[in-house]
């Protein structure tokens, strides 16, 4: 599954709206659950969304670090590395974010992504 670009993500949502169906979204907590979600989407011949919670993001960084930003980046890197092995499009999301994690998790991720966009990545 190719990781969705802004354009392919919008197209995925437009197709779902026109077809009157929902895009499946699965919370993932590890490389195993991410791989299982990708396989499930492929088996169902469906695009999909994978989401990482604040706890899942912390787990991805390693149990001795619990760094949500590093874990989120690791999740995304792994998804990009294996995503092309599967057909379809997959969107990457963070799951619900408690307000107490906005400044230490979501805002840094947004800053990192803004810098990547500036560099054309």
Predicted feature residues:
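Catalytic domains of carbohydrate-active enzymes, especially glycoside hydrolases
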Residues: 32-52
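Conserved active-site and cofactor/substrate-binding residues in soluble primary-metabolism enzymes
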Residues: 4-8, 28-32, 70-74
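Active-site beta->alpha loop and helix N-cap motifs at the rims of alpha/beta catalytic domains
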Residues: 54-121
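N-terminal amphipathic alpha-helix/helix-capping segment at the start of soluble metabolic enzymes
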Residues: 1-24
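Structural preference for beta-strand elements that scaffold enzyme active sites
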Residues: 21-25, 47-51, 85, 89-93
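Conserved, mostly hydrophobic/aromatic
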Residues: 27, 37, 95
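Generic secondary-structure signature for well-ordered alpha-helical cores
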Residues: 14-18, 39-46, 80-84
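Gly-rich Lys/Arg/Thr-decorated short loops/hinges at beta-loop-alpha junctions or inter-strand turns
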Residues: 16-20, 51, 58-59
């Amino acid at each position: 599954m190719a990781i969705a670009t802004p354009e392919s993500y919008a197209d995925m949502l437009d197709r779902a709206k026109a077809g009157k169906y929902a895009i499946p979204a699965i919370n993932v907590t590890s490389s195993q659950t991410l791989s299982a979600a990708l396989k499930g989407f492929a088996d169902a011949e469906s695009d999909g969304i994978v989401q990482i919670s604040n706890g899942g993001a912390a787990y991805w960084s390693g149990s001795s670090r619990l760094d949500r930003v590093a874990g989120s980046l690791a999740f995304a890197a792994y998804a990009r590395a294996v995503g092309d092995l599967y057909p379809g499009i997959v969107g990457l999301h963070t799951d619900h974010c408690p307000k107490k994690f906005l400044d230490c998790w979501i805002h840094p991720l947004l800053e990192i992504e803004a810098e990547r966009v500036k560099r054309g990545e």
